[in-house]
Amino acid sequence: METKSSQTSHPWLVLLIFATFAVSIFAVYSNFPEVSADEKVHLKYPRNLEDAKQLGRVLSKYKENNYSVVLCGVIVVYVFLQSFAIPGSIFLTILSGYLFPFYVAIVLVCSCSATGAAICYTISKLFGRSFVLQKFPERIAKWQDDLSKHRDDFLNYMIFLRVTPIVPNWLINIASPVLDVPLAPFFWGTFLGVAPPSFLYIQAGSTLEQLSHTSVAWSWSSIVLLTGSAILSLAPILLKKKLKSD
């Protein structure tokens, strides 16, 4: 049970997390090389595909001589967006595919997604329980009943949820601590589960200049990839059920 003093400290902890991100973003911005006034207006997190294109052009111009600054900037902003459930990470995923080699981009996106989700999880665990229970009472009750039967399969369920678009990622992040999902399977399930959809957007990002909308990342082959990944994530659970029934 939480004490009154620990409950009081929670808002300060969130402010500390927010301040840490603010300082980190400022540090990256301060270490970025001098840019023209026209370029400076595009140094912001992308809200749409056109923003991503403009930002990509600026970052790619300075990336060769300032690789670590560009990389750190993408990481800090990506984790920040994930931590506070701010829309825009999909465009950073596409941008990562444009700026970095595939293997760097996929590790970056999976790591940032898992880290940001874990921070969001922690914030929700500290003081978001009443909000989640009040806003989503029926869903939480149903999920609690379902998960109570599969306490040993949290990792597989988390991978499945991240691969499929059944539940919004932000809702998974804030509901998981309320459902007593341990942080370890939550983190690694997120890391592994976001890989298949991120693969598609990173590939699309390699042709960012030609993209007209984000839906071009989707095709029958991409649907097959995600469906196959979802089935594989549930395969151990289904196999375990079959062995028990036999």
From Swiss-Prot:
Major localization listed first in the record, in broad terms: membrane
Single GO BP term: autophagosome assembly
UniProtKB keywords: Membrane, Transmembrane, Transmembrane helix
GO cellular component, one term: endoplasmic reticulum membrane
Membrane topology label: Multi-pass membrane protein
Domain of life: Eukaryota
Location of this chain's protein in the cell: Membrane
Family (UniProt): Belongs to the TMEM41 family.
Full protein name: Transmembrane protein 41 homolog
Organism listed in the record: Caenorhabditis elegans
Lineage: Eukaryota, Metazoa, Ecdysozoa, Nematoda, Chromadorea
